[in-house]
Amino acid sequence: MLAGLLAESHLMPLEQLPAKVGEHAEPAGLAHVAIYLTDLQRHVLRNLAGEGMGGCRHSVHTAELRIEGTVPGRAFQYGRLLPAASACPGKYRWWAPLLGGTERLGVLRATTEGDDPRTRQDVQLLADVVALIVVSKRDYSDAYARLIRTDTMNVAAEMLWRLLPPRAYSDGRVVISATLEPAYRVGGDAFDYVLDGPLIHLSIFDAMGHDMAAGLTAGLAMGACRNARRRNAELVEITEEIEKVLVEQFGGTRYATGIVARLNTGTGLLEWVNRGHHPPVLIRGSRWVTQLACPPGDPMGTGLGVAPEVCREQLEPGDRLVLYTDGITEARTDTGGEFGLSGFIDFLIRQHADRVPVPETLCRFMHRVVDHHVGEWQDDATVLFCEWLGSSPDRRDLAAAVAGVPLLRSATDAASAETSGIDGELPLRPDAMAPEHSS
């Protein structure tokens, strides 16, 4: 099944994927497969093939499903294979997360004859292969771009989304997640991260204004940062290169604040340069929170000549670093008050205590920011989150738990687990067999 699908994928456009998956999955005992992809803001799951009839009478591949309050939504949010009520008598229906690494792409639905550990493993393996194919095709598919949009996008957002890395990454050493709003009107915010051996480079930028020029400023800052970093420039030199590029382009009329940081995952040493930006927030354990003080340099692009400094902090395993922009703390409630830094951090701590995966935590937080917002956005809201797990790259179990990623075990191991299905799956709740979408 998987070998044939992979072989065909090299010469397959994205639009053919649902039909090809069905062709290869059904002979292996996985019937009525449907692929649902999340919208940009992660409110709904949309059928890649559109609406159509499934293989059982009255079974419909619904064109769109809500994420909140549904079984497929729960599989998406928590990264777990979940059962659901089947429209086919005597059959079993499953919802499996589609993950590009740890980036949540959507879910896959399949119907099977049995519910044994090997069957559950086959469903998740199919979902993993489908996710790899989606990731390999989406960057040059306008059909994908239209499918995941629920609103029209401005040109600045069109440019920035193409520059940004995936909103989630994890390995045994680190869990990274990011989010930004307004997704379709984003102007001057940007984030970036990259791996370089034991080093994790993190950066966040907030350009002056909320217009096309702000988007260009943020894009130039990201490009200059990457270019200098790939020439092995040190942190101060990287920010000076960004300054130089912005001054050359805008003559001092446009600037960007930002933080450029580097985490050594082998030692836990965090180094960063602050260029007129909010200080990073460090969360340790369940309660201890501090803002990491560092003498700031001037915003990049002003040409004021205030020399930046490199600051350092020794992290402990489990420490969570949070970088953010103005829009997070300045979002207004319906009574006119600000959401505030304390409300932001309290939310992160509560979600962590409830063992909510990091990508889902940031998604819920940003939904809450949007709900608090009244009127037109005056500034973008961006969060870049990084949790250092420790120096060993082999702590996959811990990374999977924090990031919400299913770990495949052998069928024998899965059969001996207390919870059914993929190892680490959440205990089955009474509502897990509820209808897969609600009215």
Predicted regions and their residues:
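Juxtacatalytic helix/coil linker segments
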Residues: 165-217
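Acidic, glycine-rich loop-and-beta core segments that form the ion-binding/anion-interacting portion
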Residues: 208-232
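Regulatory cytosolic signal-relay segments
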Residues: 126-186
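Conserved subregion of the PPM/PP2C metallophosphatase catalytic domain
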Residues: 2-6, 22-24, 28-31, 38-77, ...
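A short, aliphatic-rich beta-strand micro-motif
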Residues: 82-86, 90-100, 104
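Short active-site segment of divalent metal-dependent hydrolases/proteases
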Residues: 160, 209, 329
